[in-house]
């Protein structure tokens, strides 16, 4: 079942949580709502679920207006960050809860409930824990049980609010890959909230970048990474250097450094910022003929296959970050305190707005 939101707005007092947000999600699609704290992503998720009401706009499921439909009638599965499992119930009883509290006319028989619960526990690969209590489970196991409970009521839509946020990094990585595989089996429209860029880019079919209550960009993980639509998206998705210069007729310049600025073909000495990823910066020793930004190597730290360099510009001491393969760093023989030239080889240039 598809999900569509049209012109959603929501205020909490003077704070504008959502500002005319519109979005369409297809059946079977896994969509990530990504952004910093306070950007509106959880508010949007809660309005879709029916846990929060919008001041304006509408929510449609499969083309039918569900804006005023009670949360209990929306057939939405919701998974919270902190599991919300009943401590006094076993794993089996937690998963069965949504089925057992249905109105008598809609409640399955105990035999069908048992079969359904065992099937779901098998789906999340935890059928062997049916008689355990939440306190006897790991964080990752609790989250999978919470997901099984959400699926027990056969939701038309699955919503997850930072489902792995309370878990350690290794477990989080394992579970998000598991969620991707599970979603492909279920084939329902799923939306999950996260502030973790890596999580969104790895798991989602599409990523919705949100900022200050508005959508900045919607696209596949590859699209938003390779072609960020706004300075915010560029800055939020990974590390980036911001180099202030000027653009004229599609060329950005800073001192002797020149880079293409195809988005600014009519610019005439316009202030512009080049957004450069650390891995798109080459290094040369000071005194070479090649153009570059004079810097001094402040600090180096090695992490796996890469060396991360903190460079201080010699004109204003602003920091530039560079990332080079560890073997290349060792072959260059660079030392902290050494004078170098930072040479950006690729950038996305945005005009400075007046």
Curated annotation (Swiss-Prot):
Record's keyword terms, sorted: ATP-binding, Cell inner membrane, Cell membrane, Membrane, Nucleotide-binding, Sulfate transport, Translocase, Transport
What is the name of this protein?
A: Sulfate/thiosulfate import ATP-binding protein CysA
Q: Please name the Gene3D superfamilies in this protein's record.
A: P-loop containing nucleotide triphosphate hydrolases
Which Pfam families does this one have?
ABC_tran (PF00005), CysA_C_terminal (PF17850), TOBE_3 (PF12857)
Question: What does the UniProt function comment say about this protein?
Answer: Part of the ABC transporter complex CysAWTP involved in sulfate/thiosulfate import. Responsible for energy coupling to the transport system.
Instruction: Establish whether keyword Translocase is in the entry.
Output: yes
- EC main class here is translocase
| Native organism taxonomy | Bacteria, Pseudomonadati, Pseudomonadota, Betaproteobacteria, Burkholderiales
Gene Ontology cellular-component terms listed: ATP-binding cassette (ABC) transporter complex
Its predominant location is membrane
> What is the source species?
Bordetella parapertussis (strain 12822 / ATCC BAA-587 / NCTC 13253)
Listed under subunit, the entry gives: The complex is composed of two ATP-binding proteins (CysA), two transmembrane proteins (CysT and CysW) and a solute-binding protein (CysP).
The family assignment reads:
Belongs to the ABC transporter superfamily. Sulfate/tungstate importer (TC 3.A.1.6) family.
Provide the E.C. number(s) assigned to this enzyme.
Answer: 7.3.2.3
InterPro entries named in the record? AAA+_ATPase (IPR003593), ABC_SmlMolc_Importer (IPR050093), ABC_transporter-like_ATP-bd (IPR003439), ABC_transporter-like_CS (IPR017871), CysA_C (IPR041193), Mo/tungstate-bd_C_term_dom (IPR008995), P-loop_NTPase (IPR027417), Sulph_transpt1 (IPR005666)
Report domain ABC transporter positions: 3-237
Give its localization: Cell inner membrane
Q: How does it sit in the membrane?
A: Peripheral membrane protein
* Xref: SUPFAM superfamilies: MOP-like (SSF50331), P-loop containing nucleoside triphosphate hydrolases (SSF52540)
Catalytic reaction equation(s): sulfate(out) + ATP + H2O = sulfate(in) + ADP + phosphate + H(+); thiosulfate(out) + ATP + H2O = thiosulfate(in) + ADP + phosphate + H(+)
Which GO molecular function entries does the Swiss-Prot or TrEMBL record give?
A: ABC-type sulfate transporter activity; ABC-type thiosulfate transporter activity; ATP binding; ATP hydrolysis activity
Tree of life domain: Bacteria
Sequence positions that bind ATP = 35-42
